[in-house]
Regions:
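Catalytic alpha/beta active-site cores
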Residues: 1-220
Length: 220
């Protein structure tokens, strides 16, 4: 089976976005109607056609074109969701790419929140779906202890974190798609481990930080 070739009409693609006649304009509630949205929508058509003509076989691509079924996120030539190690980000800092801006390991709760925002926002540009960190309260609790933070200070940092994660900074004027999960109590495999903060091993363990974890969870 040989698939027919489909060419994307550049003029029609732009005009369909501008007058909102293309269903894709409203397909994603997180995507704003904007110049970035126009660029993403136009490029997405090209990528979707690449999938259908050069990745999927005609037996798979043709039924999609004919409406027998729908292949989701064809405009994203990327993996879907990814989970990352918050522990590693805290220990190493946001770096590792030559020629790009880099940061040393965070030493404070606020700077750790900033690196989380930048990490998730940057990695989001390489994936179609959510970017996730697990054990947020466990790994962030040492900063609360070291910074001797009060509840109101934690609330302020969490407000900034949540707000900044929802700024439409992703391509197409979207906000990053992010997930944070919380342990509520320290996992057994971390209870006796001493955190590494700012390249220094602290004199307490994760298991001794239940009070600090409670403050983080309450603030969130």
């Amino acid at each position: 089976m040989t698939a027919p070739r489909y060419d994307v009409d550049a003029i029609a693609t732009v005009e369909e976005y501008l007058d909102r006649s293309d269903w894709r304009v409203n397909a994603n509630a997180n995507q704003g109607y904007s110049l970035g949205g126009l660029i993403l929508n136009s490029a997405g058509k090209i990528v979707a056609n690449y999938w259908l003509e050069h990745v999927y076989t005609p037996e798979i691509g043709a039924p999609h074109r004919e409406g027998d079924y729908h292949i989701h996120d064809l405009d994203m030539f990327a993996g879907y969701c990814a989970g990352w190690s918050l522990k590693r980000l805290i220990q190493e800092g946001f770096n590792g790419v030559g020629g790009a801006i880099a940061s040393a390991p965070p030493r404070h709760f606020s700077s750790a929140c900033g690196q989380i925002v930048n990490f998730l926002g940057t990695l989001q540009n390489e994936w179609a779906g959510a970017q996730a960190f697990s054990s947020f309260d466990t790994y962030m609790a040492p900063f609360v202890r070291l910074d001797n933070m009060e509840y109101d200070e934690i609330v302020q940092c969490m407000q900034e974190l949540i707000y900044n994660l929802n700024v439409p900074s992703r391509w197409g004027s979207q906000c990053p798609f992010t997930n944070l999960t919380f342990d509520w109590t320290c996992p057994d495999d971390l209870a006796d481990e001493h955190p590494l903060i700012g390249d220094e091993v602290v004199d307490f363990t994760y298991g001794e930080l239940q009070r600090e974890m409670n403050l983080i969870n309450r603030a969130f």
